[in-house]
Structures are given as C-alpha cells and as structure tokens.
C-alpha cells in the first residue's frame, strides 16, 4: 500500500520527457514518487483530492538569508550604503542565536505556506538554522557566511567555523540538510582565503555558496584591487565548477558569462532584491543562451520583503522582457523551470520534476479562484497570476507539511508571535546603543 495518492488534479510534471496530465494521479511511497499517470490501481493510506488544482514540483529558493525575516520592513527605500551601515549591520551586530532561530522558523513557515520545498541559506548562527529545518521538514543547503576582510587570523577562525558546521550538519535530518562553504563575496574575502575555501570544499566534497558581482561597487573595487573583475579573479584560482552556487551575477561582461557557463556554475538570480536595492539587472537571457544553469532566489526579507517564489517568477519574467525590450523573453514555462528543475540541479537534490523515483516534494495549487479564472494556460497562470497564498498543500520527502492551508509541522501562531517578540527585542537593543 502506498503512503499518499494525489488524484483529480492537473499534473504539471516539469519533466521534458513526460507530457502534463490534465487529470492525473501522483502516487507516493517511502518519500519517493512511485507513479505519475492518468489512473492507478494503487491504494494508499492517505488520498488527497486535488480537484480544481495543479499538482507540481515544489519550488527551490537558491539564495536567501532566512533569519533576516526579523528585518522585514525594518529599513526600506534607502540608498544601499545607508541601509547597510546605519540599519542592517548595527542590527546584525546585536543578533543572538535565539533571534536567528525565531527568524528562521518564521522563514520556514512562510516558505511552506508558499510552496517552497528547499532553500539555500547563508547567514550566522547556522546551527539554529539547522534546528529549524530539522523541525519543520523542509530541505536546505546551509552555509555559514564567512567574512575574512583580508585578516589572516580572522580568516583562519572563519574557515574553522565553516568546517565545524560542515562536519556537524552535512547530511543531517535524514539527508534533508546539506552544508556548503559560504565565503561571503570577493569584495569581503581575499583571493588567498577564497583559494583555501575552494581547496577545503574539494577535500570535504561539498559545494560553495558565494555572492558574485551583486553591485557595480564590487566591480570597481575588484578592478582597482586586482586589475580585473570578480569572475576573472576567481577564475585565476580555479574557483569555479558545478559545485559553485553564485548569487546575483549582475555586472557581467560577455567574457564573464562564458567563464560561468563553461564551468557549469549555478547562478541564483534574485530579481526582486536586485530591483529594490537598485543593484542592477542580471543578464539572464544571455546566460541561459550560453547554457548556464540559472535558478531563482528571493534573497533575505530585508531586501525583498517576502520569500514568495511566485513573486520572484513573475518579476524575473517581466524584468527580462523590459530589459531586452522583447515580450517573448523568459516565457512562463522557462521561468517555472528556473524555480524548480534548475534550482534542484543547483542544490543537487533529486527533485524539481514529477517523475518515478524522484523525491516526493510536491505542491498543490488551488486554481479555483477569481484571479486564476478562466484558465487557458497553466504555466502562464502560475507565473503571472498566482501567489503563494494559492498553495493548498505542501509535501516534502513524502510528508505532508501543509494540507488545505493548515500547517501540520509547526505551531503557526506561536512561530509568528515568537518572531515578533524577537524582532521587537532586537530593535530595542539596537536603539539603546544609539
């Protein structure tokens, strides 16, 4: 007997080898998908009627800072330097482990409710992030954010912390948690330190998560410091490869794009954050045309201000259309692939499509709503009309985390209350020092 059968829904497989099934079934057993078909003879302990819904792979958020939910709306509409120096950095200096735990629990709740099944996170107090992921049932690729600032002693300590986190948490939560090394960025970490990180990642057989060319200021700093941009500098130390997840990648030359594509680097595009901070527009269409694996991330709530991948998909599609002045750029199905297939590839998880033997990481979206009617084209409707609030059910590793909008793995109101209190206390501590 199977664990779960999902029936009567429009099955959007995201599988290039299998057509969508307008009225199909998905059968789940032992945390895996065992059948995707029009009908089934299987029986199950749980039967979910997806009538009026779309059954599809859950989303993969490939770049965020989950604990920063506590900073949602804290300092908006400010120049980047002022935003960081006068608000975010002083607040982060007061963060405690319990703050990050409360903020991450809130982030996990928000992601479950909006259909995200896995996320890549870089922040501090990462053990607390691991605890939150372990509790809630999501998948995550976690990295301790290492900032060395050309200080050898600091770099040694940062790499030690990163290694300890890798050893303690990689593979935890029944394999739902993987750990990556997280050197923050080329403009906060020296070339020598980044080279050491690459060597350590190879030795430990783990991936790397890094910010690359998020701002024009980084581009200018790298040219002044090294006589070349971040991508070229990283290429000189053989930093790149399929085990690298590079966030942002905005200020790229054509040569930079070739380097990233040729080295199979995974690129996390964060359009909402990039627009909000006026960082620039990533050349997504050029990167995709060169064969790069471009996926989607939300960045942290301080610069987004939510973790809704529907929001990210629509923004990504619209931004590329206006940037290229081509309404056919980044069509709905392609941006859906970025949010599912490409993201799963970047995090090396066997998810992102509805296919036999793949992880049972499945969401159901309620399409029987005014803003989703009439329904002519499912991918188009999901990208341009749907929101995270339309997700009805979220399943990860064959476990139902949310059913009919009710979260089963967390006390929703308690999580919200705890995060509100943590944010209030944090701001009070910051204000007391000013």
Curated annotation (Swiss-Prot):
Catalytic activity: 5'-deoxyadenosine + H2O + H(+) = 5'-deoxyinosine + NH4(+); S-adenosyl-L-homocysteine + H2O + H(+) = S-inosyl-L-homocysteine + NH4(+); S-methyl-5'-thioadenosine + H2O + H(+) = S-methyl-5'-thioinosine + NH4(+); adenosine + H2O + H(+) = inosine + NH4(+)
Cofactor: how and how many bound: Binds 1 zinc ion per subunit.
Any single biological process term in GO: S-adenosylmethionine biosynthetic process
Domain of life per record: Archaea
Listed EC numbers: 3.5.4.41, 3.5.4.31, 3.5.4.4, 3.5.4.28
Any one GO molecular-function label of the UniProt entry: metal ion binding
Gene3D superfamilies, sorted: Metal-dependent hydrolases (3.20.20.140), Urease, subunit C, domain 1 (2.30.40.10)
Keyword NAD: no
InterPro entries noted in UniProt: Amidohydro-rel, Deaminase_MtaD/DadD, Metal-dep_hydrolase_composite, Metal_Hydrolase, MTA/SAH_deaminase
Residues that bind substrate: 92, 184, 214, 299
Keyword Zinc part of the UniProt annotation: yes
Any Pfam family hit: Amidohydro_1
HAMAP family: MTA_SAH_deamin (MF_01281)
Additional facts recorded: SAH is a product of SAM methyltransferases and is known to be a feedback inhibitor of these enzymes. As a result of this inhibition, organisms have evolved efficient enzymes to metabolize SAH via different pathways. The pathway found in methanogens differs from the canonical pathway, it uses the deamination of S-adenosyl-L-homocysteine to form S-inosyl-L-homocysteine for the regeneration of SAM from S-adenosyl-L-homocysteine. 5'-deoxyadenosine is a radical SAM enzyme reaction product which strongly inhibits radical SAM enzymes.
Oligomer and partners: Homotetramer.
UniProt name for this protein: 5'-deoxyadenosine deaminase
Source species of the chain: Methanococcoides burtonii (strain DSM 6242 / NBRC 107633 / OCM 468 / ACE-M)
């Amino acid at each position: 007997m199977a664990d779960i059968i999902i029936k009567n829904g429009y099955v959007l497989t995201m599988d290039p080898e299998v057509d969508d099934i307008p009225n199909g079934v998905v059968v789940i057993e032992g945390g895996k998908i065992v059948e995707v078909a029009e009908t089934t003879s299987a029986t199950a302990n749980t039967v979910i009627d997806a009538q009026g819904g779309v059954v599809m792979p859950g989303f993969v958020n490939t770049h965020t800072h989950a604990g920063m939910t506590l900073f949602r709306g804290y300092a908006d509409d400010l120049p980047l330097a002022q935003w960081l120096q006068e608000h975010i950095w002083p607040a982060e200096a007061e963060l405690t482990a319990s703050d990050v735990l409360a903020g991450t629990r809130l982030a996990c709740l928000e992601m479950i409710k909006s259909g995200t099944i896995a996320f890549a996170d870089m922040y501090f107090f990462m053990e607390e992030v691991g605890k939150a992921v372990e509790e809630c049932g999501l998948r995550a690729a976690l990295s301790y954010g290492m900032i060395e600032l050309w200080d050898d002693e600091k770099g040694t300590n940062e790499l030690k912390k990163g290694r300890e986190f890798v050893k303690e948490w990689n593979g935890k939560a029944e394999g739902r948690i993987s750990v990556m090394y997280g050197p923050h960025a080329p403009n906060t970490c020296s070339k020598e330190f980044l080279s050491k990180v690459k060597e350590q990642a190879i030795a430990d057989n783990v991936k790397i998560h890094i910010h690359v060319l998020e701002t024009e200021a980084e581009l200018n700093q790298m040219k002044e410091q090294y006589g070349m941009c971040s991508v070229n500098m990283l290429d000189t130390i053989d930093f790149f490869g399929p085990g690298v997840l590079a966030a942002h990648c905005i200020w790229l030359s054509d040569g930079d794009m070739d380097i990233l594509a040729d080295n199979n680097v995974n690129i996390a595009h964060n359009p909402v954050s990039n627009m909000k901070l006026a960082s620039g527009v990533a050349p997504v269409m050029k990167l995709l045309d060169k064969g790069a694996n471009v996926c989607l991330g939300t960045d942290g709530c301080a610069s987004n201000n939510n973790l809704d991948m529907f929001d990210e998909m629509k923004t990504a599609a619209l931004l590329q259309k206006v940037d290229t002045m081509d309404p056919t750029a980044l069509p709905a199905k392609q941006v859906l692939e970025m949010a599912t297939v490409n993201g799963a590839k970047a995090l090396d998880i066997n998810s992102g499509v509805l296919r036999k033997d793949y992880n049972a990481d499945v969401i159901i979206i309620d399409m029987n709503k005014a803003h989703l009617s009439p329904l002519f084209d499912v991918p188009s409707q999901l990208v341009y009309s749907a929101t995270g609030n339309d997700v009805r059910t979220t399943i990860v590793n064959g476990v139902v985390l949310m059913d009919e909008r009710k979260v089963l793995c967390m006390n929703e109101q308690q999580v919200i209350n705890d995060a509100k209190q943590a944010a209030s206390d944090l701001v009070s501590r910051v204000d007391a020092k000013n």
